[in-house]
Amino acid sequence: MSEAALSFHWSLDGFVRAYEAGAFDDQRVELIEGEIWPVVIGDWHGDAVGQLFALLPRVGVRLTNATLPTGNSLPDPDCWVRRADAAPIGSKGSRLSVWDPGDVLLVVEVSDETVIPDLSTKTRLYGSAGYPVYWVVTKERIFEHSGPTASGYRQRIEYGRGDRIPVGYAGVDLAVDDLI
């Protein structure tokens, strides 16, 4: 008898029902294109997220790390920025707000062990949702994606140590060394 690999893809509604029923209370997970991905926060990752929240400009915006419903996925970006006066345009279940992509000014993933999916799957996910700017922060550089398209982003710029990265929504730039 041979063994066959079984795979199961979650629907967004099915995942939300399970989430709201407490099925994942003892785990940090996110739903990405029908698959449940674990969310692991190590020391460097946690410190880098703290730096983002400390250094990103806050005038006229809200910084959060709430789940960001995106298409048929429920990613948990490490940080995202929305207009302070933005209102949700819908919801997924009773606890997750859906936002207009034009109100989401920056999405950030801090990548230690997740660089490949953050630069591939999540780049495609956030770009196709229409979020204007997406950063992937690693220990050595920040990848800035802009110009969202149906398959990702038109432009990717890498910023390394010693560089400054523009924060477009605020008209300022930050030292990469301070963020990584």
At which residue positions do the language-model features occur?
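Gly/Pro/Ser/Thr-rich low-complexity, intrinsically disordered segments predominantly at protein N-termini
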Residues: 1-180
